[in-house]
């Protein structure tokens, strides 16, 4: 025995109170830091870190405005244009505007009207009419709003039954400043190795941003609570729904937090009941639950201590740690009870020593191999998935330490209980498996081959195309709000098409003299201007002139005609609106440039700035895509748009940029396929190597990998057959499945090897293994599968998938390791004859 082993047994067996005091102190320390634990469901946590489209998205967001606004749909019981409804909308709008972080609230009461009655350009310079203006003709206003190319399906539904309010938040300059600092250093890191000073700067910048981001999310969550409280005061007379990215972020965090608390406690209670039924002694319930709690507290505290937020992807890490810790506990408890039944007169401490000695090696390799399975996620290239891999690596390490430090130290202090080893239902089940596979070994093999073929076919049906709306149940506000906005307000998910001027345009242009034209056309407003200063944009801009505007119109009509797109806005929309004022002005470049210069600033901010750069050389088409469309194929849609603009409309490829959250999310989904293939390849190679080290037998290592491959492929195959898409949550299922299957495989092979040495009879060794280690495997699988079935009650669909698929993967791992693996061992005889 090594000096390290002697020291370990000295601490556990002779100084258990000191060991417990030390461990308790550490757990309390981390429990204190758990107060800093936080969740992060922001869009920044759900995108590819080195995505060039993300960099471009942030540039466009800074130039044209952010997607981070709230959208309130308002469906009144009375007529939308009645005085009482307009009064209620005004009161609601004013209350929302009083929120400190709100910059503005845009409603149908605030937008400029130009046909109610018809006005001239000079009228607009003097006064802009709105729905509340005394001069406004209410009948004409109704017609204008319902038929406006700008407002219809943006602020009012086409049937006039519903309106929408856009709540714009003030830009948090500090947040964006810290974000930019961090991103600049991250980008530099991708280009070249950072110097020590730069690494420190990146560390500080990341820490500062994380801290500020946490407070920013907390404020945003409070704002949304305030908005909902204000909305509740107006629900008597109208149906209201809340939408927008900030709301989705906040509600996702609430769902995750709810699942962590409610279902975490529910799973815990269910596991306690199941352990009580199985082991029928209080100590075998209390000890494993204390160890599971200690592991969870340590990990939550550690994440809080290092300010490492949990995302939608990694939100199930506590559940997984519970699985892994409990699995280790069950194997130790079953082994102790076996030894107690065999060595009835043995000393309590000696039984614990034997329990540890016989289980430390397989448990160590189980933990190590499971770590390898989760560490494989690090190669995915997706930040939240990478973080999840690291979290599980640290968490599994802690679970192993807790299992072999806290559990035996507590067990030593308890007086031994007498127990005779007797058969039970579990023994009958595992014995039945052993007898059945001996009689029907060929049928077992054929069955698994059929399952494998079906799994491969199912895997070929796997898709990454999924709808964000499918994350939520139909009765949730997010789901209902998205459906309503899709049906009545022209789509949910933002997509921008940005088109630059061609590269060869940026050269000095001849200024076209426009003298003598002033006498030919009366604009109806004062032309006190300097021609050199004011008559410039149509002559210097590539797009904002009548040579190019028909092309812009054609692009707009193409985008608007796509079945996947709802509301499309562009400079073409704005010019259609202005054309109703004076078509001659819009059709003449010189006067169009004057119009652009002289139009009031609030009109310019509404009609020009969101859709065209200041120099007129870049266009932005804002599109809302129908998120609830079951036929939505993001990648195909983006490729179709790009192909049409380049191949059919003659634009250069470098001119066309697609951006927005739809593009970023699509990039993430597409990378999932690549990372899934890469992840599984890496993990199986690594596990094969770990098996070889653990078993020191290449043939046994190759046999042992088979149940793991089948378990993982079956789960992925089921996902394919059931049309469950690969997304940012379900990508981790394969790694989870492999990690769980590895646990069973290593314990079974180690026990089989021990039993085989007794008489070198393969089938007898298998029967003894089934009746010993098979029991522990069965207990673990049944307990955790039933426990995690509670997650099926969640409102968050990814949590439901996680609970059910995890349970299914455990059952498949158990079946493969208790049936197929023994058959392969007997057939191929890895230990010789």
State where each predicted segment sits:
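Alpha-helical transmembrane segments of multi-pass inner-membrane proteins
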Residues: 18, 262, 266, 314, ...
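Hydrophobic, glycine/alanine-rich multi-pass transmembrane helices and their short helix-loop junctions
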Residues: 274, 303, 364-406, 411-412, ...
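Signature of alpha-helical transmembrane segments and their immediate interfacial
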Residues: 1-41, 404, 408-409, 413, ...
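Extracytoplasmic
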Residues: 58, 62, 135-277, 281-282, ...
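Hydrophobic transmembrane alpha-helices and their membrane-interface caps
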Residues: 284-333, 700-749, 789, 816-820, ...
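Helix-loop junctions and hydrophobic alpha-helical segments within the transmembrane domains
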Residues: 339-368, 756-779
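Juxtamembrane segments of multi-pass membrane proteins
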Residues: 440-589
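Interfacial segments of transmembrane alpha-helices in multi-pass membrane proteins
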Residues: 257-310, 379-383, 678-723, 793-797
